[in-house]
């Protein structure tokens, strides 16, 4: 043949690039609204809020599909090592939510008898399927300066614009 390996490699890579080059007709598959917002056995839409005294209580809600009949939340004082911790388990109040897209179960728990000014770790699930551990800090019994970020309901362009608002707010929020 008399062709060098260097020339062969150059020709081969050039021809290969023709096979993998993008074309104008390619479009990403758009996921339907029904599929995109379908609940599953995995908890999602986890929302932490206060219900009473922020030094000693905290409430959490989350969504699952309707096959999950009972929800639970586990909570414990967060430790520095991140290793196992002693947790208390709370049974959720489960409510059926009907919408034009799909039905879901919403689960709600209020953690009580918490220690003031303490960092807690919590997770939610059905006893088999759990979220990761999330953290919050209870308020102090004495008035102290604090900051918070308030978000309204964006409704539209959540991925393209609203996610940037979240990142910017967390970056600029004083601690």
Predicted regions and their residues:
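Divalent metal-dependent phosphoesterase catalytic cores across multiple superfamilies
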Residues: 26-175
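Sec-dependent signal peptide recognition
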Residues: 6-13
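Short, Lys/Arg-enriched N-terminal segments with co-localized hydrophobic residues
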Residues: 1-4
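A composition-driven signal for long, intrinsically disordered, charge-rich low-complexity tracts
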Residues: 7, 21-24, 106
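Hydrophobic h-region of N-terminal signal peptides that target proteins for export
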Residues: 14-21
